[in-house]
């Protein structure tokens, strides 16, 4: 059986009170519509068609390699939205999954179970349902005495008895494709909203003698539709718990999983430990046997094995195996920390490579520089890379020693085995085995204390 998917993503989402198109709001680093399309892709469909509306260019850009598109000019109901996919799917044989783009928690497993049930029962239509603790706002599943699905009644159209029903429509359906598009021709907008409801297709099919069924999924939380910021936060919390549990099952330890925020595409190796209040975002990859302490933030970075990150921020950077950083340090974009290097506290590194086993201990800025291996950078060193117009590069060779409080004014080259005395301001290249001293000479004034006003203060005697 060929499988097809229609994703409904044309809604404006006015309750989000946002300039951003509703399905583009993110849940754990991915837009809601990406979550839906990725879950649907897991069933290996022949084609996915995403229905978009005015101003949906960003949706098309994000899903360009994952979906075809249909355009709904006016948002006049889910039935009309699905009908826009007729040109792409109307003549196809097989089954079509219809799902909304604002339901990011659905899983591939649930979609597979729905298709399986649909095929086994020989249904023309199967609705995915769930038992809701509080069904307010959802369409209710109305069954006959034998348990067969008669219709779905929307909140604003239901009578008191119908609204007591707790089995709800999740907004996900599986249809015989050709019967779906034939039935859509007969859907009207005679309802309180004046819209063309996709749910009316079920009653039309049933009246035509077709078999209509329902598959009740066990986990109601998957069906959460995001219509406002409250629901967005709920979806994020649920997704975060799911992500963290998956990592724990794969051998990652979380000290406090409730406060660790990990994006959906993050990869983490086994035997890594993550403390609470840690944020890991984007396409970050973290190796095995790492330790990440509270307050750390890692974005779009690659972390090797055996790395320790202590309360530090890492953005678009790389840390090789057996390196460490922190506390309170910052790797900015294009920072590369080679194997065995040590980055201490209050260090900022930007667009610089730190060589193997090099130590940058504390209170240092390294920008636009290449440092070799086995170098010691003293406390308070500054790599001065900007003249107000352009940025310049500094090179420091292997086995060099940069004394505390030094300033290296780019562009300069410091050769291998060079020594820079503390508190020097270096403006010229330093040769191999050379020592550079660039500071004022010390002068001692004998007995100068007694010339100071403080010398007459008894507390200072």
UniProtKB/Swiss-Prot annotation:
Q: Which reaction does it catalyse?
A: alpha-D-glucosamine 1-phosphate + acetyl-CoA = N-acetyl-alpha-D-glucosamine 1-phosphate + CoA + H(+); N-acetyl-alpha-D-glucosamine 1-phosphate + UTP + H(+) = UDP-N-acetyl-alpha-D-glucosamine + diphosphate
Residues annotated for UDP-N-acetyl-alpha-D-glucosamine binding in this entry: 8-11, 22, 72, 77-78, 139, 154, 169, 227, 332, 350, 365, 376
Region: N-acetyltransferase, residue numbers = 251-461
Q: Which residues form a coiled coil?
A: none
Domain of life (superkingdom): Bacteria
Alphabetized PROSITE patterns for the sequence: HEXAPEP_TRANSFERASES
Pathway of action: Nucleotide-sugar biosynthesis; UDP-N-acetyl-alpha-D-glucosamine biosynthesis; N-acetyl-alpha-D-glucosamine 1-phosphate from alpha-D-glucosamine 6-phosphate (route II): step 2/2; Nucleotide-sugar biosynthesis; UDP-N-acetyl-alpha-D-glucosamine biosynthesis; UDP-N-acetyl-alpha-D-glucosamine from N-acetyl-alpha-D-glucosamine 1-phosphate: step 1/1; Bacterial outer membrane biogenesis; LPS lipid A biosynthesis
Q: Which residues bind Mg(2+)?
A: 102, 227
* Region (Linker), start-end ranges: 230-250
List the residue ranges of the region (Pyrophosphorylase): 1-229
Q: Does the keyword Cell wall biogenesis/degradation apply?
A: yes
Biological processes annotated in GO: cell morphogenesis; cell wall organization; lipid A biosynthetic process; peptidoglycan biosynthetic process; regulation of cell shape; UDP-N-acetylglucosamine biosynthetic process
Binding positions for acetyl-CoA?
Answer: 385-386, 422, 439
Q: Per its UniProt record, what InterPro entries does this chain match?
A: Bifunctional_GlmU (IPR005882), GlmU-like (IPR050065), GlmU_C_LbH (IPR038009), Hexapep (IPR001451), Hexapep_transf_CS (IPR018357), NTP_transferase_dom (IPR005835), Nucleotide-diphossugar_trans (IPR029044), Trimer_LpxA-like_sf (IPR011004)
Q: Where is the active site?
A: 362 (proton acceptor)
Q: Which cofactor does it need?
A: Mg(2+)
| EC assignment | 2.7.7.23, 2.3.1.157
Keyword annotations for this protein, in alphabetical order, are: Acyltransferase, Cell shape, Cell wall biogenesis/degradation, Cytoplasm, Magnesium, Metal-binding, Multifunctional enzyme, Nucleotidyltransferase, Peptidoglycan synthesis, Repeat, Transferase
Q: What does this protein do?
A: Catalyzes the last two sequential reactions in the de novo biosynthetic pathway for UDP-N-acetylglucosamine (UDP-GlcNAc). The C-terminal domain catalyzes the transfer of acetyl group from acetyl coenzyme A to glucosamine-1-phosphate (GlcN-1-P) to produce N-acetylglucosamine-1-phosphate (GlcNAc-1-P), which is converted into UDP-GlcNAc by the transfer of uridine 5-monophosphate (from uridine 5-triphosphate), a reaction catalyzed by the N-terminal domain.
Entry similarity comment = In the N-terminal section; belongs to the N-acetylglucosamine-1-phosphate uridyltransferase family.
> What subunit structure does UniProt give?
Homotrimer.
UniProt protein name: Bifunctional protein GlmU
């Amino acid at each position: 059986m060929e499988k097809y998917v229609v994703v409904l993503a044309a809604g404006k989402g006015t309750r989000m009170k946002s300039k951003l198109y509703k399905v583009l709001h993110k849940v754990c680093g991915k837009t809601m519509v990406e979550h839906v399309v990725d879950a649907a892709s897991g069933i290996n469909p022949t084609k996915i068609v995403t229905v978009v509306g005015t101003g949906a260019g960003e949706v098309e850009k994000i899903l360009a390699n994952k979906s075809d598109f249909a355009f709904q000019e006016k948002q006049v109901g889910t039935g009309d939205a699905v009908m826009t996919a007729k040109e792409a799917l109307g003549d196809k044989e097989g089954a079509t999954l219809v799902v909304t783009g604002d339901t990011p928690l659905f899983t591939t497993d649930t979609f597979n179970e729905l298709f399986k049930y649909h095929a086994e029962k020989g249904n023309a239509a199967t609705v995915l349902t769930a038992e809701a603790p509080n069904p307010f706002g959802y369409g209710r599943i109305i069954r006959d005495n034998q348990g067969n699905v008669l219709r779905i009644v929307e909140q604003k159209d239901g009578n008191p008895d119908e609204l007591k029903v707790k089995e709800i429509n999740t907004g996900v359906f599986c249809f015989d494709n050709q019967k779906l598009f034939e039935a859509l021709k007969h859907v009207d907008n005679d309802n309180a909203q004046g819209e063309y409801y996709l749910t009316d297709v079920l009653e039309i099919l049933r009246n035509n003698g077709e078999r209509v069924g329902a598959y009740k999924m066990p986990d109601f939380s998957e069906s959460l539709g995001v219509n406002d910021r409250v629901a967005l936060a709920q979806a994020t919390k649920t997704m975060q718990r799911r992500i963290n549990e998956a990592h724990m099952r794969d051998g990652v330890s979380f000290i406090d999983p409730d406060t660790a925020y990990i994006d959906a595409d993050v990869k983490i190796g086994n035997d890594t430990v993550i403390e609470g209040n840690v944020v890991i975002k984007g396409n970050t990859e973290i190796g095995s046997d790492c330790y990440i302490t509270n307050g750390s933030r890692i974005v779009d970075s690659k972390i090797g094995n055996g790395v320790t990150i202590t309360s530090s921020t890492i953005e678009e950077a790389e840390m090789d195996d057996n390196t460490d950083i922190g506390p309170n340090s910052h790797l900015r974009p294009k920072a590369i920390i080679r194997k065995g290097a040590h980055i201490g506290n209050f260090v900022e590194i930007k667009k610089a490579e730190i060589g193997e086993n090099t130590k940058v201990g504390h209170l240092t800025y390294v920008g636009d520089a290449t440092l070799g291996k086995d170098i010691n950078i003293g406390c308070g060193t500054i790599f001065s890379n900007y003249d107000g117009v352009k940025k310049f590069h500094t090179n420091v060779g292997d086995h060099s020693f940069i004394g505390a409080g030094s300033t290296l004014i780019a562009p300069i080259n410091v050769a291998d085995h060079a020594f820079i005395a503390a508190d020097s301001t270096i403006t010229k290249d330093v040769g191999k085995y050379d020592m550079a001293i660039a500071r004022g000479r010390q002068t001692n004034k004998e007995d100068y204390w007694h010339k100071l006003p403080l010398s007459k203060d008894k507390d200072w005697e």
